[in-house]
Amino acid sequence: MTENTKTHVILLSCGSFNPITKGHIHMFEKAREYLHKTGRFIVIGGIVSPVHDSYGKPGLVPSRHRLTMCQLAVQSSDWIRVDPWECYQDTWQTTCSVLEHHRDLMKRVTGCILSNVNTPSTTPVIGQPQNETSAIYQNTVNKSVAIKFWGKMSESLGKICCVRPHMDRFTFVDENANLGTAMRYEEIELRILLLCGSDLLESFCIPGLWNESDMEVIVGDFGIVVVPRDGADTERIMNHSSVLRKHKDNIIVVKDEIDHPMSIVSSTKSRLALQHGDGHVVDYLSQPVIDYILQSQLYINASG
Protein backbone atom coordinates (compact mmCIF):
# COMPACT_ATOMS: atom_id res chain seq x y z
CA MET A 1 0.00 0.00 0.00
CA THR A 2 1.17 3.53 -0.74
CA GLU A 3 1.20 6.16 1.99
CA ASN A 4 -1.84 7.87 0.54
CA THR A 5 -3.90 4.67 0.38
CA LYS A 6 -3.18 3.68 3.97
CA THR A 7 -5.66 4.73 6.64
CA HIS A 8 -4.36 7.76 8.50
CA VAL A 9 -5.11 7.51 12.21
CA ILE A 10 -5.37 9.84 15.18
CA LEU A 11 -5.27 7.99 18.50
CA LEU A 12 -7.51 9.51 21.19
CA SER A 13 -7.17 8.49 24.82
CA CYS A 14 -9.78 9.59 27.36
CA GLY A 15 -9.28 9.16 31.09
CA SER A 16 -8.66 10.72 34.46
CA PHE A 17 -4.87 10.97 34.04
CA ASN A 18 -4.70 11.37 37.79
CA PRO A 19 -1.77 11.63 37.30
CA ILE A 20 -0.58 10.81 33.80
CA THR A 21 2.08 8.09 33.94
CA LYS A 22 4.88 6.72 31.82
CA GLY A 23 2.48 3.84 31.17
CA HIS A 24 0.04 6.17 29.41
CA ILE A 25 2.77 7.45 27.09
CA HIS A 26 4.03 3.90 26.54
CA MET A 27 0.50 2.93 25.47
CA PHE A 28 0.56 5.58 22.73
CA GLU A 29 4.01 4.54 21.54
CA LYS A 30 3.21 0.80 21.46
CA ALA A 31 -0.06 1.39 19.62
CA ARG A 32 1.60 3.55 16.97
CA GLU A 33 4.43 1.05 16.51
CA TYR A 34 2.00 -1.86 16.14
CA LEU A 35 -0.32 -0.04 13.72
CA HIS A 36 2.61 0.93 11.52
CA LYS A 37 3.84 -2.68 11.48
CA THR A 38 0.51 -3.88 10.09
CA GLY A 39 1.23 -1.89 6.93
CA ARG A 40 -2.37 -0.66 6.84
CA PHE A 41 -2.18 2.44 9.00
CA ILE A 42 -0.18 5.64 9.45
CA VAL A 43 -0.57 7.25 12.86
CA ILE A 44 -0.39 11.00 12.35
CA GLY A 45 -1.22 12.18 15.85
CA GLY A 46 -2.17 11.34 19.42
CA ILE A 47 -4.57 13.19 21.70
CA VAL A 48 -4.70 13.04 25.50
CA SER A 49 -8.13 14.15 26.74
CA PRO A 50 -8.43 14.42 30.55
CA VAL A 51 -11.89 13.96 32.05
CA HIS A 52 -14.03 16.82 33.41
CA ASP A 53 -13.83 17.69 37.11
CA SER A 54 -17.46 16.67 37.63
CA TYR A 55 -16.68 13.05 36.77
CA GLY A 56 -16.88 12.44 40.50
CA LYS A 57 -14.02 10.02 40.95
CA PRO A 58 -12.67 10.07 44.55
CA GLY A 59 -9.30 11.80 44.81
CA LEU A 60 -9.56 13.42 41.37
CA VAL A 61 -7.44 16.58 41.47
CA PRO A 62 -8.69 19.70 39.64
CA SER A 63 -8.33 19.67 35.87
CA ARG A 64 -5.95 22.63 35.88
CA HIS A 65 -3.40 20.39 37.59
CA ARG A 66 -4.11 17.34 35.45
CA LEU A 67 -3.86 19.35 32.24
CA THR A 68 -0.54 20.82 33.35
CA MET A 69 0.85 17.40 34.27
CA CYS A 70 -0.29 15.96 30.94
CA GLN A 71 1.38 18.81 29.09
CA LEU A 72 4.61 18.22 30.99
CA ALA A 73 4.44 14.50 30.21
CA VAL A 74 4.14 15.00 26.44
CA GLN A 75 6.32 18.09 26.05
CA SER A 76 9.10 16.08 24.42
CA SER A 77 6.77 14.28 22.01
CA ASP A 78 6.44 15.50 18.44
CA TRP A 79 3.14 13.72 17.82
CA ILE A 80 1.13 13.56 21.07
CA ARG A 81 -0.73 16.62 22.35
CA VAL A 82 -3.06 17.45 25.23
CA ASP A 83 -6.57 18.67 24.48
CA PRO A 84 -8.45 20.70 27.14
CA TRP A 85 -11.88 20.65 25.47
CA GLU A 86 -13.35 17.97 27.72
CA CYS A 87 -12.21 19.80 30.86
CA TYR A 88 -13.53 23.14 29.62
CA GLN A 89 -17.12 22.00 29.14
CA ASP A 90 -19.87 22.84 31.62
CA THR A 91 -20.19 19.24 32.73
CA TRP A 92 -18.84 15.73 32.25
CA GLN A 93 -18.82 14.45 28.67
CA THR A 94 -19.27 10.87 27.53
CA THR A 95 -16.45 9.16 25.65
CA CYS A 96 -18.76 9.02 22.65
CA SER A 97 -19.31 12.79 22.67
CA VAL A 98 -15.55 13.42 22.97
CA LEU A 99 -14.87 11.23 19.92
CA GLU A 100 -17.62 12.98 17.95
CA HIS A 101 -16.27 16.40 18.95
CA HIS A 102 -12.80 15.60 17.65
CA ARG A 103 -14.15 14.06 14.47
CA ASP A 104 -16.18 17.21 13.77
CA LEU A 105 -13.24 19.42 14.72
CA MET A 106 -10.93 17.65 12.29
CA LYS A 107 -13.47 18.09 9.51
CA ARG A 108 -13.63 21.84 10.12
CA VAL A 109 -9.99 22.60 10.82
CA THR A 110 -7.80 20.22 8.84
CA GLY A 111 -9.72 19.86 5.61
CA CYS A 112 -8.86 16.14 5.72
CA ILE A 113 -11.20 13.35 4.77
CA LEU A 114 -12.92 11.94 7.85
CA SER A 115 -14.57 8.56 7.75
CA ASN A 116 -16.05 6.13 10.20
CA VAL A 117 -15.03 2.49 10.22
CA ASN A 118 -18.04 1.59 8.10
CA THR A 119 -17.86 4.55 5.72
CA PRO A 120 -16.99 3.37 2.18
CA SER A 121 -13.78 4.99 0.97
CA THR A 122 -15.58 5.74 -2.31
CA THR A 123 -17.79 8.25 -0.51
CA PRO A 124 -15.40 10.20 1.73
CA VAL A 125 -16.37 13.14 3.85
CA ILE A 126 -14.27 16.18 3.00
CA GLY A 127 -13.73 18.71 5.74
CA GLN A 128 -13.85 22.38 4.93
CA PRO A 129 -11.16 24.42 6.74
CA GLN A 130 -12.00 27.61 8.55
CA ASN A 131 -10.85 30.77 6.81
CA GLU A 132 -8.76 31.93 9.76
CA THR A 133 -6.84 28.68 10.05
CA SER A 134 -3.60 28.23 8.17
CA ALA A 135 -1.39 25.18 7.89
CA ILE A 136 2.32 25.17 8.60
CA TYR A 137 4.39 22.37 7.11
CA GLN A 138 7.73 21.67 8.75
CA ASN A 139 10.10 19.29 6.97
CA THR A 140 12.81 17.53 8.98
CA VAL A 141 15.52 15.16 7.81
CA ASN A 142 14.58 11.46 8.22
CA LYS A 143 11.55 12.42 10.28
CA SER A 144 7.86 12.82 9.72
CA VAL A 145 6.36 16.04 8.49
CA ALA A 146 4.78 17.90 11.37
CA ILE A 147 1.60 19.69 10.44
CA LYS A 148 0.34 22.28 12.87
CA PHE A 149 -3.06 23.81 12.41
CA TRP A 150 -3.60 26.96 14.45
CA GLY A 151 -6.94 28.54 15.09
CA LYS A 152 -9.99 28.57 17.27
CA MET A 153 -11.05 25.08 18.34
CA SER A 154 -14.76 25.18 19.11
CA GLU A 155 -15.03 27.43 22.18
CA SER A 156 -11.44 27.08 23.34
CA LEU A 157 -8.08 27.95 21.87
CA GLY A 158 -5.75 25.09 21.22
CA LYS A 159 -3.43 23.41 18.80
CA ILE A 160 -3.71 20.38 16.60
CA CYS A 161 -0.33 18.83 16.02
CA CYS A 162 -0.30 15.89 13.66
CA VAL A 163 2.70 14.02 12.34
CA ARG A 164 2.70 12.08 9.12
CA PRO A 165 5.35 10.64 6.78
CA HIS A 166 6.66 12.79 3.98
CA MET A 167 4.20 13.22 1.15
CA ASP A 168 3.00 15.86 -1.24
CA ARG A 169 1.19 18.77 0.33
CA PHE A 170 -2.45 18.04 1.06
CA THR A 171 -4.92 20.09 -0.96
CA PHE A 172 -7.48 21.87 1.17
CA VAL A 173 -10.95 21.77 -0.27
CA ASP A 174 -13.15 24.85 -0.20
CA GLU A 175 -16.49 23.81 -1.64
CA ASN A 176 -17.44 27.46 -2.15
CA ALA A 177 -14.40 28.25 -4.28
CA ASN A 178 -14.35 28.11 -8.07
CA LEU A 179 -11.52 25.60 -8.43
CA GLY A 180 -12.00 24.84 -12.11
CA THR A 181 -11.85 21.49 -13.84
CA ALA A 182 -8.06 21.13 -13.56
CA MET A 183 -8.02 20.89 -9.75
CA ARG A 184 -7.33 17.40 -8.38
CA TYR A 185 -8.17 16.51 -4.80
CA GLU A 186 -5.82 14.27 -2.86
CA GLU A 187 -8.04 11.91 -0.91
CA ILE A 188 -6.53 10.82 2.37
CA GLU A 189 -8.69 8.69 4.64
CA LEU A 190 -8.50 9.77 8.27
CA ARG A 191 -9.99 8.00 11.27
CA ILE A 192 -10.03 8.76 14.96
CA LEU A 193 -9.58 5.59 17.01
CA LEU A 194 -10.14 5.30 20.75
CA LEU A 195 -6.94 4.17 22.46
CA CYS A 196 -7.41 2.31 25.72
CA GLY A 197 -6.15 -0.42 28.02
CA SER A 198 -7.84 -3.75 28.54
CA ASP A 199 -9.43 -2.43 31.75
CA LEU A 200 -11.59 0.00 29.78
CA LEU A 201 -12.45 -2.73 27.28
CA GLU A 202 -13.53 -4.95 30.17
CA SER A 203 -15.75 -2.18 31.52
CA PHE A 204 -17.87 -2.53 28.37
CA CYS A 205 -18.97 -5.90 29.77
CA ILE A 206 -20.35 -4.45 33.03
CA PRO A 207 -24.17 -4.26 32.71
CA GLY A 208 -25.55 -0.72 32.86
CA LEU A 209 -22.16 1.00 33.01
CA TRP A 210 -22.17 2.09 29.36
CA ASN A 211 -25.03 3.37 27.24
CA GLU A 212 -25.46 0.69 24.58
CA SER A 213 -26.04 3.19 21.77
CA ASP A 214 -22.79 4.94 22.77
CA MET A 215 -20.98 1.61 22.66
CA GLU A 216 -22.33 1.01 19.16
CA VAL A 217 -20.94 4.36 18.00
CA ILE A 218 -17.58 3.98 19.80
CA VAL A 219 -16.87 0.46 18.57
CA GLY A 220 -18.98 0.34 15.42
CA ASP A 221 -18.30 3.78 13.92
CA PHE A 222 -14.92 4.78 15.32
CA GLY A 223 -13.10 1.63 16.40
CA ILE A 224 -10.77 0.83 19.30
CA VAL A 225 -7.08 0.14 19.72
CA VAL A 226 -6.44 -1.88 22.88
CA VAL A 227 -3.07 -2.17 24.61
CA PRO A 228 -3.53 -5.05 27.11
CA ARG A 229 -2.28 -4.74 30.69
CA ASP A 230 -1.07 -7.49 33.02
CA GLY A 231 -1.56 -10.22 30.42
CA ALA A 232 -5.30 -9.59 30.15
CA ASP A 233 -7.25 -12.06 28.01
CA THR A 234 -8.82 -9.66 25.50
CA GLU A 235 -10.42 -12.52 23.56
CA ARG A 236 -12.34 -13.59 26.65
CA ILE A 237 -13.35 -9.99 27.39
CA MET A 238 -14.70 -9.42 23.88
CA ASN A 239 -16.72 -12.64 23.99
CA HIS A 240 -18.55 -11.38 27.09
CA SER A 241 -20.14 -8.43 25.28
CA SER A 242 -22.58 -8.69 22.38
CA VAL A 243 -21.50 -5.27 21.07
CA LEU A 244 -17.81 -6.19 21.20
CA ARG A 245 -18.50 -9.52 19.50
CA LYS A 246 -20.57 -7.81 16.82
CA HIS A 247 -17.83 -5.29 15.99
CA LYS A 248 -14.84 -7.52 16.70
CA ASP A 249 -13.21 -6.54 13.41
CA ASN A 250 -13.14 -2.91 14.57
CA ILE A 251 -11.10 -3.76 17.68
CA ILE A 252 -7.34 -3.81 17.19
CA VAL A 253 -5.45 -5.57 19.98
CA VAL A 254 -1.79 -4.59 20.20
CA LYS A 255 0.15 -7.82 20.52
CA ASP A 256 3.53 -7.84 22.23
CA GLU A 257 5.57 -10.97 22.82
CA ILE A 258 7.49 -9.28 25.63
CA ASP A 259 5.84 -8.10 28.85
CA HIS A 260 7.05 -4.52 29.10
CA PRO A 261 7.38 -3.14 32.66
CA MET A 262 5.42 -0.05 31.64
CA SER A 263 2.33 -2.22 31.05
CA ILE A 264 1.82 -2.59 34.80
CA VAL A 265 2.28 1.08 35.66
CA SER A 266 -0.91 2.77 36.81
CA SER A 267 -2.07 6.08 38.28
CA THR A 268 -3.16 4.24 41.43
CA LYS A 269 0.34 2.80 41.95
CA SER A 270 1.80 6.24 41.34
CA ARG A 271 -0.43 7.92 43.92
CA LEU A 272 0.36 5.26 46.52
CA ALA A 273 4.08 5.62 45.84
CA LEU A 274 3.81 9.38 46.35
CA GLN A 275 1.88 8.99 49.60
CA HIS A 276 4.39 6.51 51.00
CA GLY A 277 7.49 8.31 49.80
CA ASP A 278 8.36 5.33 47.64
CA GLY A 279 11.41 6.01 45.48
CA HIS A 280 9.97 3.78 42.76
CA VAL A 281 7.74 6.69 41.78
CA VAL A 282 10.50 7.66 39.33
CA ASP A 283 9.70 4.45 37.46
CA TYR A 284 6.06 5.46 37.13
CA LEU A 285 6.13 9.19 36.43
CA SER A 286 8.37 11.46 34.37
CA GLN A 287 10.55 13.85 36.36
CA PRO A 288 8.75 17.05 35.25
CA VAL A 289 5.46 15.53 36.45
CA ILE A 290 7.01 14.51 39.79
CA ASP A 291 8.45 18.01 40.24
CA TYR A 292 5.06 19.60 39.57
CA ILE A 293 3.29 17.23 41.98
CA LEU A 294 5.76 18.02 44.76
CA GLN A 295 5.62 21.74 44.06
CA SER A 296 1.81 21.72 44.10
CA GLN A 297 1.59 19.25 47.03
CA LEU A 298 -0.71 16.90 45.11
CA TYR A 299 -1.66 13.38 46.23
CA ILE A 300 0.62 13.52 49.26
CA ASN A 301 -2.23 13.32 51.78
CA ALA A 302 -4.89 11.98 49.42
CA SER A 303 -6.53 8.60 49.91
CA GLY A 304 -6.05 5.81 47.32
UniProtKB/Swiss-Prot annotation:
Major site of localization recorded for this protein: Golgi
Domain of life: Eukaryota
GO cellular component, one term: Golgi membrane
Keywords carried by this UniProt record: ATP-binding, Cell projection, Cytoplasm, Cytoplasmic vesicle, Golgi apparatus, Lipoprotein, Membrane, NAD, Nucleotide-binding, Nucleotidyltransferase, Palmitate, Pyridine nucleotide biosynthesis, Transferase
Gene Ontology molecular function, alphabetical: ATP binding; nicotinamide-nucleotide adenylyltransferase activity; nicotinate-nucleotide adenylyltransferase activity; protein ADP-ribosyltransferase-substrate adaptor activity
Covalent lipidation (S-palmitoyl cysteine), chain numbering: C161, C162
GO biological process: one example: NAD biosynthetic process
Pathway: Cofactor biosynthesis; NAD(+) biosynthesis; NAD(+) from nicotinamide D-ribonucleotide: step 1/1; Cofactor biosynthesis; NAD(+) biosynthesis; deamido-NAD(+) from nicotinate D-ribonucleotide: step 1/1
Topology term for the membrane: Lipid-anchor
Binding-site list for ATP: H24, T268, K269, S270, R271
Cofactor note: Divalent metal cations. Mg(2+) confers the highest activity.
Catalyses which reaction(s): beta-nicotinamide D-ribonucleotide + ATP + H(+) = diphosphate + NAD(+); nicotinate beta-D-ribonucleotide + ATP + H(+) = deamido-NAD(+) + diphosphate
Cofactor entry: Mg(2+)
EC numbers: 2.7.7.1, 2.7.7.18
Location(s), subcellular: Golgi apparatus membrane; Cytoplasmic vesicle membrane; Cytoplasm; Cell projection, Axon
Name of the top EC class for this enzyme: transferase
Binding of NAD(+), residues: S16, F17, W92, T95, G197, D199, L209, W210, R229
InterPro entries with a match to the protein in the record: Cyt_trans-like (IPR004821), Euk_NMN_adenylyltrnsfrase (IPR051182), NMNAT_euk (IPR045094), Rossmann-like_a/b/a_fold (IPR014729)
Any Pfam family matching the protein: CTP_transf_like
Oligomeric form and interacting partners: Monomer.
Function: Nicotinamide/nicotinate-nucleotide adenylyltransferase that acts as an axon maintenance factor. Axon survival factor required for the maintenance of healthy axons: acts by delaying Wallerian axon degeneration, an evolutionarily conserved process that drives the loss of damaged axons. Catalyzes the formation of NAD(+) from nicotinamide mononucleotide (NMN) and ATP. Can also use the deamidated form; nicotinic acid mononucleotide (NaMN) as substrate but with a lower efficiency. Also catalyzes the reverse reaction, i.e. the pyrophosphorolytic cleavage of NAD(+).
Family note: Belongs to the eukaryotic NMN adenylyltransferase family.
Official protein name in the record: Nicotinamide/nicotinic acid mononucleotide adenylyltransferase 2
Species, as recorded: Danio rerio (Zebrafish)
Gene: nmnat2
